[in-house]
Amino acid sequence: MNIPQEFDTIRPWEPEDLPEVFDRLLLNDQFKQVLAYLYPQVPFEMIAQKLKACKTNLDFQLAFAYDFVHGILKKAATGCEMDCTSLDNTRNYTFISNHRDIVLDSAILDVLLIDNGFKTTCEIAIGDNLLSLPWVKDLVRVNKAFIVERALSMRQMLMSSKRLSDYMHFAIKEKNENIWIAQREGRAKDSNDRTQKSILQMMSMGGEGSIIDRLKQLHLVPLSISYEYDPCDFLKAKEFQQKRDNADWKKGPTDDLVSMQTGIFGYKGHVHYHAAPCLDDYLDSLEPDMPKQDIYNKVAAYMDEQIFKNYRLYPGNYVALDLLENSTAHQAEYTAEDKAKFEKYIEGQLAKIDLPNKDEAYLKEKILEMYANPARNYLAAQ
C-alpha cells in the first residue's frame, strides 16, 4: 500500500517491512530470551520459521498473539466476553475506552473482535514512553501499533498531534482498519474514568470539514472495559503514596515493565467488554454551529456516560463502595461470602506493597477507591 512518507516514524510496520523486521528481532538476545520464556518446549528454529511464514501483521497476530492472549485468559481469568451487538462487524471503528491495563486492554480487544466475526483487529495507539527498547518498538509495530510521541515542546506537540490525527484518519479511510485509543493519556490509576478533551481535539485535527464531520469520519465507539480484579491495584496504590510523600517522585525505568508483567500474568477474575453504539448518529444530532469548546465538552461528557452505563459491575465494586462510605446501602448486590472474599483479597494485595513508611490506612483507601469509583459512576449514569 502507498502510505505517505510523513507517517513513516509512527505507523505500524507494513507487510513489505516484515521480513527485515523479523530478521532484526530474531538476532536480538532479549527477544530470544522472551521467546524462550514464553515457549520453553519449542525449538528457536521452529518459532523463527513460524514467524517468517507470517506475510501480514494479521497473520502474526493470528499465529502468535491470539493464542497467547487466550492462554493468559485461560490461566488468569474466570471468563471473558464482549457485547458488541450495537455494532456492524463488517464496518471499521475507532474504539475509545477506559484504560486499565497497559498491554491487555487492546490485546484482549483484538481477540474479542476476531471471536465476534470482525474481519480484522485494531491498530493500537501506544505512547513512546513505553518503547525505550528498539526491539520492543519493532515488536509492537508488527502487532499493529502506531506511536504517540510524548515529552515534546509545545510547537513539536502541535505538529505531532496533527500527524497522529492525519494517520488515524488515513488508517480508517484508506486502510479500512479499526483503531483502539485510550480515552486519556495513561491509565486512570483511581479508575475514575474521564475522557480528556485533548484526545478529541487531536482527533479532529485530521480529516475534512467541520469538527463534527472530522469526528464522524473516525466512527467513534465508546468502549467499557471491566476487570473483576486489577492485578496492578497494589502497584497503583504504592505509586499514590510515593507521589503523596514526595512531590518530585518519578517512575523508575523498570516501573512500567513491572506493571506490564503484573498486568498480563496476574489474576483478573471475570473480564467484560461492552461497546456502545457508534457516535455517528449522536454527532449528527449536535448543532453544527455550536462553539468548538462546547462540542468537545458535550462529546466528552456523552462518551463518559456511555462508558459508565456499560460497565459490568462485580460484587467487589459494591463491597468497596460500602466499605468506603461505611454503609450497607448496596448490600443487596453481594453476599456475606462475597464481602469476606473481597476483604481477604484486599489484605493480600496490601501485603505485596513494599514501602519503608507504609501507610496501611491510606493504601487500603486508595485500593478501595479503584473498585468503588466504577460503581459510583455507573450508579450516577443510570
Name each region found by the language model:
Residues 15, 24, 28, 32, ...:
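Short, structured coil/loop segments at alpha-helix boundaries
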Residues 295, 307-382:
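Long, low-complexity C-terminal extensions of enzymes
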Residues 64, 160-164, 295, 299:
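Soluble or luminal CAZymes and related metallo-dependent hydrolases
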Residues 58, 68-279, 346, 350-353:
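Soluble catalytic domains of membrane acyltransferases
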Residues 257-323:
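C-terminal structural cap/anchor segments
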Residues 1-93, 99-110, 114, 121, ...:
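Membrane-anchoring hydrophobic helices of lipid-metabolizing enzymes
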